[in-house]
Every structure is written in structure tokens, then in C-alpha cells.
Amino acid sequence: MESVRHRIALLFANEADIQDVETVEDGVIVFPNSNITIQDRWTYAIDYELDSIRRISWRNPSSTRQFSVIESRLAPGFNIYSNDKEARLNLFGIQPVYSPMYKSLHSETWKSINEILPGGKNLNIPWNPELCDYDILITANTVQVFSYCSLVEKKKFVKDAGKVEIGLFHVDTEDEEDINLSGLRCTWEDTSNNIGKCEKTTLFYKPFHLYVDDSSDIAPITIENTNGLHPKMKIDLSGIRKDKDCRHFVFSQLPSEIFVDKFQSPGSIVFGLDDLELPDYKVNSLSWGSESIVTLKEGQINEITYFSRYLEPKERASNKTVGFEPILFKACQVGKEEDLSNPFYSRSLGYEAYFSENTKFYHINSTSVHVNIPYPNKNDIGNIEYTTFGIVVLAICYLIYKLLRPSRKLSTVKRD
């Protein structure tokens, strides 16, 4: 890496909490008096072309951290995206899912970033996947790393390699069009490790990710037949009116054990593993699963039907629990003249890529759902095989009998 610049932004719950920040000679000390989101942004300038990877994101699937106005809505898990159609993307020993917009790899567990980047480049970032989310955007000669964490204990921010400034913000005003952040911006001196004067600052921007309050009550998500091979997810939009500039969608990354039945789920698009016949133990080495995006209808309850794959038999009857987190959102078109760029996050590959640049995303609900898939009992396999074999033999014998049996001729009796 040739050079790095490091900026920090802290989002406080209110203006009063910023007053509790202590400014010392070499930095600032912040106390976790309320819910505080920390965004670290590292920008690396490099002098060579990177390969096909264009975005890497991580959000802990078990995280309960709430999204804030300074961050993008990341898909859960560890995700790698590429839009290079020529290059291969077969990390983790599995094949990617291909869609018209990108190819992707997904894992529920954290992977080493330094091992994924070309040449094993070390970014010298203190990764903390348990508590933080990450969004890494890669262009030809630049790597940008966005980190989002919650402040859980008192922390002192001091200068390190490339660190230039820290912003302390709170939401002054917010609506569906604009967000106004007010606060302080402090910079470190170039010639020393001391922090300079902190100045008042204000930021106006138009977000393209917005989060609806009390969302679980607006559009509840439920799952039915959770112990069968054909579970159904119901999304209740009966209380939502149709808008000519907006449509509702649900995006899901599904493990190999389950996939959307696109024939029974109108408006669904599925990429990846969707073979109806193959059991899970035949496909889980081929790819990680599938992606689906379903167009929903406002004013009614929407049903999405899934197929569960047959699992490898076990000695005793049991179930395997698999889960996923559908992302329910409303996508709205805005005027092309409206600038949706902002200093905190950028649009990139992922579900955002299915929509135009002038799209706003209103996130309504993201409820984790689970289904139980039964394991076949190994002890029953013999009986099933013998029964199936017997039925097949009887069917063949019956067909042979029908084919070889002498045909009856119809006779007529002439009456006098």
C-alpha cells in the first residue's frame, strides 16, 4: 500500500452528549453515555491494478446493533462481489452465484480480509467482526474500508498512521428528503501528534438508505410450515398503499438447503442453486446457495413458497435448523437531478445493483426466520428401498401382462 488516510466520525444520540467529550492535548476522550456509532474510514491509494473483487462486506448475522443514518444497509454475513465477467471467483473452495449484475460469494462466518486481497496485502486494521460491520469498496487503484461499531466503553482517540480528523455529530433535523448533522470537527496537526482546534460544523446530505421506525408492526414477516419440506413466508403489506414511484421488494441470501419455488412465488427472480431434484449433500459442494429478489404487492398478504432439499440420512430421526434474514424494503425512484451522494457511504454491488442510481431504499423490516428440515432415518432406508423395488416390479409385471395378454374380439349376434 502506498499511502493511507484515516477519518473518524462519531454519531451521538443528541447534542448534550457531545458536550461530555473531553479534548486533551493529543486527542479526544469519548464516554459511552448513550448509543454512539463510530465510523472509521480508511482510504488506501495503491500503485497497481487489483483483481476482480470489487466489494467485500461483513455484518455479523447474530448482531443486534441498530443501523444509523451514517451507514449503508449491509446484507448479513460475509459477502464478496465482483462484476468482472472474465475473472474467476472461487474462494472458499466453492463456486459463486451468478446474476446479470455480479457474481457473489457468501458465508455466515468471518473470513480473513488480508488473505482475500491480492498478494495477501495487510491493511493494518484492527478487525473486530464480533462487534463491528465492514464495507470495503475497491476500484482500480483505491481501497476504501468503512467500519461501523458501537462505542461500548470509554475510548481515547489519538493520532495514528494516516489519521487526519475526527467528526463529532448528532442529528439536528431529519426527514425523508434530507439529513442535517451538526457538531464538531477536530483535526490533528501535521507536524505533531497534537490535536488542533475543534470547529463547529454542519453537514446536509440526501441519504439513499432510510430506516422506518416501528417497522416490524408495519409489515410483519411470518413463516409457516417450519417443520416441512415446503415452508412458506408471509409478508403482510395489507396496510400499505401502492405508490406510483415506489415498489416493495424482499431480498434474501438462502443457504443450499432451501431455495425459492419461483413457479409458486409470482414476481420472484432466483440466481444460484435452484435444481428441484438434487439433495443438499449433492449440491452443497457446488455453491453456497442462492439469491432471490421478489417483487411484492401492496395492499395484501404476500406468500413466498420455498423448497427444502433432502438431507443426508442419519441414524436417528432429527431436524436441521437453517436460517436466513430477508431484507424487506421499499424502492422509490427520485428525480435524476437529485444528488444522492453523501460523505458516509456509497452505492455499490449487492442488492443495490438491481436498481437505478436514482433509487432510495426505505428499509421496513428484517426479521431472521428459521425452518426445520427433517433428516431421513437411515434405519428406514432399507424398508423404503424394498417397498419401492416391489412397487416397481409389480408395475413392470402389470405392463408386461397388459402388453402380452391376447386381445378380445368383439362379436355381434345376428338376430332373425
Curated annotation (Swiss-Prot):
GO BP annotation list: ERAD pathway; GPI anchor biosynthetic process; protein processing
Keyword Endoplasmic reticulum part of the UniProt annotation: yes
Q: In which pathway does it act?
A: Glycolipid biosynthesis; glycosylphosphatidylinositol-anchor biosynthesis
Glycosylation site list = N35, N180, N319, N365
The entry's keywords: Endoplasmic reticulum, Glycoprotein, GPI-anchor biosynthesis, Membrane, Transmembrane, Transmembrane helix
Q: Which residues lie on this side of the membrane: Cytoplasmic?
A: 405-416
The record's Gene Ontology cellular component field reads: endoplasmic reticulum membrane; glycosylphosphatidylinositol-mannosyltransferase I complex
* Any one GO molecular function term: mannosyltransferase activity
Q: Where are the transmembrane segments?
A: 382-404
Compartments, as annotated in UniProt = Endoplasmic reticulum membrane
> What's the stated role of this polypeptide?
Required for proper folding and/or the stability of a subset of proteins in the endoplasmic reticulum. Component of glycosylphosphatidylinositol-mannosyltransferase 1 which transfers the first of the 4 mannoses in the GPI-anchor precursors during GPI-anchor biosynthesis. Probably acts by stabilizing the mannosyltransferase GPI14.
PANTHER family this protein is in? PROTEIN PBN1
What protein family is recorded?
Belongs to the PIGX family.
Which named protein is this? Protein PBN1
Its gene?
PBN1
